[in-house]
């Protein structure tokens, strides 16, 4: 992915991520993580502490879509904000609500596309992906544990 290409398409730049911005939001995310959504995760002992990983999840929050940011909060509290991680976000967010998209970029969101994911991996970053996207958002509750590729 060329610099010209990454700068001309919203969500394609890996340069918008801001560790200081992330740190400033940690207390807010912690409250949502612990008290509102009451997130529980496990399996972190299987994540290498040094190497990059590809984390695959599924959306279960309906229109709220807290999954990605809560996962990123969990990542940051375990590994700090300096360990590179990017979350793939639906490219239409930049068209629908550019303000939310810009906030997402500061926390490490990039447009969901093979080229952006590949660029992040080449940089040595880990990547979070939710392959079911909008389909997972609106699936019936009894299918909440199914991941749609």
Region locations from a protein language model:
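Short amphipathic alpha-helices and their capping/turn segments at secondary-structure boundaries
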Residues: 116-122
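Short glycine/serine/threonine-biased micro-segments
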Residues: 106, 122, 130-131
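Membrane-associated lipid acylation/remodeling enzymes share a hydrophobic transmembrane-juxtamembrane segment
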Residues: 126-149
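Short, well-ordered loop/turn elements at secondary-structure boundaries
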Residues: 49-50, 122-124
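Membrane-anchoring hydrophobic helices of lipid-metabolizing enzymes
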Residues: 1-115
């Amino acid at each position: 992915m060329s610099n010209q290409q990454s700068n001309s398409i919203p969500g394609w730049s890996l340069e918008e991520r801001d560790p200081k911005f992330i740190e400033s939001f940690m207390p807010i995310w912690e409250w949502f993580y612990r008290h509102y959504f009451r997130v529980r995760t496990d399996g972190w002992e299987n994540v290498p502490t040094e190497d990059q990983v590809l984390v695959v999840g599924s959306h279960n929050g309906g229109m709220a879509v807290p999954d990605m940011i809560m996962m990123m909060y969990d990542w940051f509290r375990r590994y700090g904000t300096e360990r590179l991680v990017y979350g793939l976000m639906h490219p239409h967010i930049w068209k629908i609500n550019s303000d939310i998209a810009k906030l997402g970029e500061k926390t490490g969101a990039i447009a969901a596309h093979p080229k952006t994911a590949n660029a992040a991996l080449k940089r040595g970053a880990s990547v979070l992906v939710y392959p079911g996207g909008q389909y997972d958002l609106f699936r019936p509750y009894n299918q909440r544990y199914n991941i749609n590729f």
